[in-house]
């Protein structure tokens, strides 16, 4: 049996269609509404994870973090998990993604991380223009914005 952990019905549609055409039995665990009993052993099968860090943009705040706990449960019981906890960990952090890429000598754009508007402004003052900002967890390009100068960036933060 294939178990699909996800929180986005739209993304799953082509997989659902293909698995049905193939006659592959599967069960969906929609993690925004389903929670397995973590006090018992998980069912036998293959667990395919389609979780996205951008779940909050669909009203599913906290679902990736809950899914991380479920993945630990599955992995602790030796289940076959495709896109398991290591993949989800990378999905949840641009900083960790970039660090993993750099560990394999893959080029990444010059990247800074900040937690507050004050930190963003401090970093931006020392950056050459133009520069691009991106949210850590946004999805589908949400929050990607180009700034041609510091003043425009400062105005955007004040808005």
Regions found by a protein language model. Name each.
Residues 7-110:
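Conserved N-proximal alpha/beta basic substrate-recognition cap immediately N-terminal to
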Residues 1-7:
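Nucleotide-activated donor-dependent transferases that construct or modify glycoconjugates
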Residues 1, 86-159:
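Active-site nucleotide/adenylate-binding loops and adjacent lid/helix of ATP-dependent enzymes
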